[in-house]
Amino acid sequence: CYIQGNYMVKNLPPLDGTDVNWSLYQSQFVKSTIVWVIIAIVCLILFIVLKYDRIKKAVSYISVFLLLILVSTITVLSINNNIFEKKEYARFTKVDQFEMSTDTNFIIFLLDAVDEECFWQVWQEHPEYEDAMTDFTFYNNAMSGYAYTEHSLPLILSGEWFENKEPFIDYRNRIFKSSPFFNYLREQGYTLSNYDDEYKFEKGVMDGAFNNITYTKSSLWDRSLFNTRIIKMVGMKYAPYVLKPYCWFNVSMLKNQEMGSKDEELFSWRNDDFYKDVQEDDITYVDGKRFKLIHLMGAHVPFYFDKDVNVIDDADYYTSIGSSMTVTMAYLNKLREAGVYDNSVIIILSDHGYNIEGEAVKVAQKNENETGRQHPILFVKGLNESHDLQVS
């Protein structure tokens, strides 16, 4: 297990929900099996040569040594980080999701992982998209600063790179709490709401930052299922490759067990959940200015949806892009029908692209920083802007 988990981890499949094609890992299956067989033979030879009592004694010493290391590690972590304490976290709810200002609205509509090149391939098959994006300007030279949301979104909101001068979590919290962009909006009288379920913050960190925050506690509603998934995570690293297909699962499912809503309904970033809300919920009107950051799943793995936002078994990256546009068009139409479209600044963008040639798609694991992830989409519409779709 030690050798497998420390020296044979270069080409591990992703745990982000990507549908893994295990046939691409045959060489890893063979290498892993050979190593395990060799180690088993060596252990058997040692058992015969050194005799049972000596092997038993050696294994006992090694086991006690490893146990002491684990106990000391857990002790230090429990003292310094209160790991056994049920902590409260700030999460974002659906509160005021469709509350719009009769004065001015500023909306950032973020579709995760939509690559510009692949987006245009889908666009060309759907002429209705151009009519839906009337009044917008598309910027075809946008580049993402980072390849993943965790780093990319704080950069988008602040223009500030993470330079490792502080712990990343402190940088992230500072950006979400008081980036110059957010501070400017507050000075202009905007009420800020953030609709996202990818982030959680420790209690107190985000107090007063957004209008739709609630506190949730850890709630392991199915301990046996949770423990099974944790064991599977360990198996993905330390088990031989022949067992890894049985250990794979989407780690985002842990999040669904970790948090339980305290009072209000938590926001869900899934395209189908938001699409349902768009169809069923009514827009309400207020006088003050409103800012909304809406972060949806977009074309992020795992792929669930067809272009009509139905859950299907054979969904892929392109159908997920289609579902993203269906949700986007429905939202824009809702704003138009409610009369709050013209008085809204609307930015539709992705935080990064997607490496369509990457892991579990056509070839085995590539460098995670493939340039395909650096080309997002960016559409911008200003107040009372009226013209055909423009490309800049």
Label each residue range with its predicted role.
Residues 1-35, 43-392:
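Catalytic domains that recognize anionic headgroups
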